[in-house]
Amino acid sequence: MFDIGFSELILIFVVGLVVLGPQRLPVAIRTVMGWVRTIRSLATNVQHELAQELKLQELQESIKKAEAMNLTTLSPELTQTVEDLKQSAQKMQNDLNNANQIGKLTDEQVADIQQNIANAQPSEITEANELDESKLTAYYPPDDDLVSPSTTKLEQDKQNVN
């Protein structure tokens, strides 16, 4: 990198030992090595970023060339891929539109129910709630703890003895 040979490194080490002394030389070497590592990592990052920018620029140029050719002279595989992507995008757009329509229908149904509740008489609301409760009890049977048994266990034991 700097084209420094072994003899030049030893000369720098001896000068550093004379100038800094044996106590401060290791600290100075660690500090300099930290700087060297930082500079190397920065240089590596710059190289990677430049390489990415060059790749991106080449990709943009190839896209511009493809657009200039009007996609007519592309290979059949690329044409098929473009068509597949267009179909996928259209399908996603249709699914999104369907989801929006379902959301609108649900909002309309909620508004209708709220309007019916607002327009209903109190007796109709009570009657509707009672019907809902009867549907719930028909669908969900009551818990065993809440239902009193017809005969207790003691009575069953007495009947079994007789």
From Swiss-Prot:
Keywords: Cell inner membrane, Cell membrane, Membrane, Protein transport, Translocation, Transmembrane, Transmembrane helix, Transport. The gene is tatB. Belongs to the TatB family. GO terms for molecular function: protein transmembrane transporter activity. NCBIfam families: tatB (TIGR01410). Its main location: membrane. It is found in: Cell inner membrane. This is Sec-independent protein translocase protein TatB. The Tat system comprises two distinct complexes: a TatABC complex, containing multiple copies of TatA, TatB and TatC subunits, and a separate TatA complex, containing only TatA subunits. Substrates initially bind to the TatABC complex, which probably triggers association of the separate TatA complex to form the active translocon. GO terms for cellular component: TAT protein transport complex.
